[in-house]
A protein has these predicted regions:
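Ubiquitin-like/PB1-type beta-grasp interaction modules and other compact soluble beta-rich domains
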Residues: 1-30, 41-80
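Carbohydrate-associated surface elements
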Residues: 38
Length: 164
């Protein structure tokens, strides 16, 4: 799905790179952004709308892009909610969709049950029952964006902001 080589292109087709997105390996080239490499690999949808869970893909090319939030790396260098249109591809990059990467396939499985799950259904169904402790984690994982970093960042920084 790549466009033809152009003389003004910033992409160097002689330097292939490999990266991982949502636990799948892909190939790109030096000069690609994460978004352009995903589109070139035919990954057109990698986010979900907040309210209805509709598929979202790239509609812009820069900072104005609203749908391209991804989380980079793993461990202490985990960085949530970065825009895929602003991330230059590098060899070994690891990224996941910020709008709950696991829910993209899972939501497709539970789509037939949507008519039984109106907004807030879990408050009426599970809150006052013992089942809530079992169901709560799974329901919360279906909503919201990315997770907070859970490990310590081992990098050294010259400035520390202690007011946060």
């Amino acid at each position: 799905m790549r466009i033809e080589k152009h003389s003004n292109s910033l992409i160097d087709y002689n330097q292939p790179l490999s990266f991982v997105f949502n636990n799948k390996a892909y190939k790109g080239f030096k000069g690609d952004t994460l978004a352009s490499a995903l589109i070139a690999n035919n990954v057109l949808y990698y986010a979900r709308s907040f309210k209805y869970g509709r598929k979202r893909g790239i509609i812009g090319a820069g900072v104005e892009e609203p749908n391209s939030l991804v989380s980079l790396e793993i461990g202490g260098r985990y960085t949530p909610n970065m825009k895929a249109t602003e991330i230059m591809l590098y060899d070994g990059l690891s990224a996941v969709s910020s709008s709950n990467p696991h829910s993209i396939d899972f939501r497709a499985m539970i789509k037939p049950l949507h008519r039984f799950m109106p907004a807030g259904f879990y408050y009426k169904t599970f809150i006052k029952q013992k089942v809530w402790s079992i169901v709560e984690d799974r329901l919360r994982s279906l909503s919201g964006f990315s997770k907070a970093p859970s490990e310590i960042d081992e990098d050294v920084y010259y400035h520390i902001f202690q007011h946060t």
